[in-house]
Each structure stands twice: as C-alpha cells, then as structure tokens.
C-alpha cells in the first residue's frame, strides 16, 4: 500500500499537503511510524498484513505543475538532515517500513529514482534499508521524456535499476525494455537478479507463496468493512482532528435556537473525503450532522454560493424535452460501447448528479464498472442569451450540439468543464452527451444547461430574516487541490494554489452576512492552511475541520453543539496572507513554517477548547548518567474551567548558540484529559534525539553540547510558552 506520505508540508500552496501529517519533522515521523506499524502488523508476526510505503523520497513538496521537470538544487545540508530526511530515516530504522517510493523530481541534477546517492548511499548503506524501492508512477519514463537525463527508455531502465529502484510503477513502462538494455550492455542479468529477489521476498512476507490458511491476515472477513466499530473510529478521528481557532462565546450553540446553514461545503459529499481516499458506503455531510443534532425545523439551509464561482446557474432543463417529456433522457448499457439492448432509460428534470462512489449506481440495473450512457435532449430557449452547458465527470465523454462536437476527453480525476452557447429564442438545439467508464476508475457525472447569473447577496440575506446565527460552511475541496490536477481557476494551478486566501466569492458572502449583523460561525474545510485574516475579524467563531471523512458531519455537529469538547491542535501554520510566503519553488526553509517564521495568524500547535487549563510548577531535571533520557520535564496541569477537556502539552527546544538554526523545534508532546478542577502531574522525557541537531562544524547530525532553551506550553506561540534554560554537557 503506497502510504504514508511523510513529505514535509513546507508551503500551504502545495495541493498534496493534505496527504501529509503537517510541517513538523518530529510530528510527521511519529504519525508515519504509527501508520506503518498499523498497516504492516507486528514485526513478531510470521507474515506482514501488507507492505507500507514511505513516500515520496525525498525533498518533495510541490509545485505539482513542475514536478516532472524540477531540479531541487538549493537545499542546504541543515535543511536536508533536520527537515526533509528525519521522517524517512525513522520509518526505515524504527518502523521497519517495507517499501520506499522515490519521487519524480531531480535532486542535485539526478532524478530521485536514478540517484545512487539517495537510494544506495543514504537509504541502504547509511540507514540499512534492505527492502524494495518503487518509483512514483511514470518517474522512470521522466528520465528520457522530461528530465532528459537518459536518451532512451533502455538507458532509463538500466539507470533506474542500477541506482536501486526495484519496481517501476506506471506510465511509459521503461522496465519492459530491460531485455533490450541487457542486449545493449547497459546492465547485466546478475544486476537485475538482486532486485527480483527483493520483490520475491516481499511476496514471501505477505504469505503469497504459502497456503492461504497459513496467513493469519487472510482470515480477516470483508464483513468488517464499515462495521459499527470502524465507523465509531472514523467519528472519533474526525472529532479529535477538529481545531477551534476562534470563539467569542458563541459556541457551543443551543440545539433549540434557529440557525441558518449556508455555504458550498455544507452538503458536499466528495469534499468530506479528501484525496487518495477510500470510498465510504455512506457519508454524513455537515448539513446532515447539524440537522440530526438540532432538528430540521430549527435549521434553514441555503447553498448561497459555489466554492469559487461568483455566479449561480439558473437551470434551463424545464425548457428541454426528450420523447415529449421535460428534461434530459439518459439511456444506459452494461458495456462501454453502447451496444445491444439498453439496461434502462431515465428522465431528469433537475441537474444531473450521479456517481458510483459510496456503492451508488448511475441508474437502476446499471453496474458500477464497464458501463456507458447517452444523455440526450432538445433545448428550445425561451429567450436569446448566453447559455452554458456545465458538466463534471470522471471517465470518457463526447459532447455534441446539433451534431457538432464541442469536446471529447477522458480523465481519472473529477474534472469540471464549461461550454458557452449563444442561443436564440425559439431555435432548436439538440444536445448529445455520450459517456463511458474507463478502466477501473470511479465514475461521476454532473450535467446542467442554464444561464449564469450574478449572486444576489441581499436576496439571500432577506431569506434569513429572524435568524441571528449563521453557520457558514466554506473553504475549498480536493476537487481544487490535489495531485497534478487540470484545474485552471483563479487562485489554483495544476492541483496547487497560487494564493492561499479564501476564494473571493466566499469572502464576499461572509462580508455581506457580517454587515447584515449576523453572528457567524465559519466552518472551514480544507486540506491546507487558508489565510483567514478578514474572516477572523468578521466571524464570531472559526472552526477548522479539514476534510473530515465519512462520519465528519456528525463530528462537526458534536463540536458545534457542545457534545464534544474540541481538542485539536494545528499541525501547520496559518499565515495572514500570501504575501508572507517565500517563492513556492524555493526549497530553503528560511521564512517557512513555525520553525523559521514568527508572525502567523494562527500558530502551529494552536487550538482552543470549551474549557481552560493552567500549567504550573514547571521544572526540568537532568537525568543521571546511563539513563535513557537526558532530561525530564515536570509540571502540574489543571483544568480551570467547567467542562471536561483535553490539553496537549508541547515541548520545543532551541540551541542558543546557533544563529542560523530554527526559532524552536517540537521535540515532545503529551495529551492529557482532565475533569473540571482536576490536576494531573505531567512528566515528559527528553532523550538524545531531542538534542540531535545539524552541526555545521562537522557537517553531521549529532548531539551538540551547549546552552539550550526549552519551551513548554499549549502551542508554538511565544505567549503560550514558558521558557527554561539548560546546559547540555
């Protein structure tokens, strides 16, 4: 299984940062190790449950749009060893990860999947990795197509294998040319053999060569999928991840009060999943969760606006006819060629939105894979105007109007498209959309014909008369940020973002709500940090919920209405604006993350609660020689509020005599749950790793003696920390 992604989320513009565990090396390492151990099973077992994969090795965190041509050549030794490498090293040496995926880009002029320094010298010789390396998909083909480090597929294949890449994933299939590479003398069969051995060893570890019943993991029943216990775990994960960023005594909400729920993510199922997601058999949206908690009669729902578009679509489907019926006719076949007798025919008078996600089908009797459809209608406009055909799809399509092909394409990513038509009143327009699935990709289709009209903010606000509190559910989604996407919208490029502000239409909507005197709870959904400076002024409460998963709607409602006390802490820095960010393509850590940046809107490690805590009597003791720890921190943490709550005690370290070093670096943390008025003793040990830093004098990572500052508190903000001074001999 190609997870976990332990790249460092160094820049919030990176679309795949949502897959990672944040911007901190220590946190990323701990989370990555836990994932590997959970996926592979105990080391003492005869067989592995599966083979986890540490990716993308190494120094890989965007931009998506340049990853096939990029040459990362400005990484200092300090950044390499203190920031980019620690998680990979720990997953190899501590968690015994069985696979490592090499990245697309070049590092110091060599493609990562062809770098002997990365794959042999560091990974195998220094760290002792003895398992398999897999290329990112298509990375070997990049050698001769984009990087131009190889002139032929044969040379690329030999280079990849000799450098240490055991498995080629994906497009181009250079390794299919290995027999030709052998014939040309570029590589020997003996050199190939050791890589084949590694692949076979992986299969042996999975029990593939033994009797099925001998492997304990083969006895896991499919019936556990989406079982009650797993859904409860999904709910608890979502609850614990929610971060309360601001609360002017508006939260928790009363279940008896009238509220409005507005925003593009309130009832957005795909947003809940994020990217590289499993497909749940059901999903609780945030609107679902709020309605279940407060009752439908107390909740007024208006979508208000889309994620990015500053318009709404007035649908013309009632001006369309097929077989004498209003709307669009959809005809379906259980093959991809639209041949033979159709399975069924359906008619749509509302915009089409169908998917195979969550075990759904496009229509009754239509299977989930290997099917096709034809959507047809005759559109007779009631007025002359600029109409639009809007669609969003996964699979392959061909769109025709009056027999003329407007577009034809296929994609495995959910791709939006828009086509303008200058239509005349009373004229006939025959619209035909042919669709079929491709390979085993999921299938999605949205289709509408209409007119784009500017958003009328005042009309929406008029509908909210008598409602004081508005829950605005906005942000972005994995349909805008993700891996190498064809998105071309202001603020987004190729899966990344070009600026980190909230999309303009949402910012304007919140401004109008605030000016109308509404008390706003802003629920922000995103896989990355959003610059929320204006929203922090206009909203009484801000809740960061990320992409919260199949039970996310229940989790969000639990927090909003006080059935769960938020305890999440930010794993990334929330900047005030895009102007605070360095060049996206610059991999230097200077000015990035809490370790080298000191003026955030919301700091790394920050997160509020419905109760309050006080950490007192903080002291640090040096441990005797021979102890596994160098120092032990002691403190007394008290819940000074009226609700049970959980605080995360965080410990940061800074070396005083290191002018170029980080401002502080997370080295330990402890999660503590307390009842109202309860006090607990907290003890946190700091071992050699807490003081293992890059030493510019020796150009190595080692325990560096000298003066240190140790910070203890509830976030990385200076005002949330207490400082202790120590000397390490």
Model region roles, listed by residue range:
Residues 722:
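Short, structured beta-strand-loop surface elements
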Residues 1-696, 700-718, 727:
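Glycoside hydrolase catalytic-domain context in secreted enzymes
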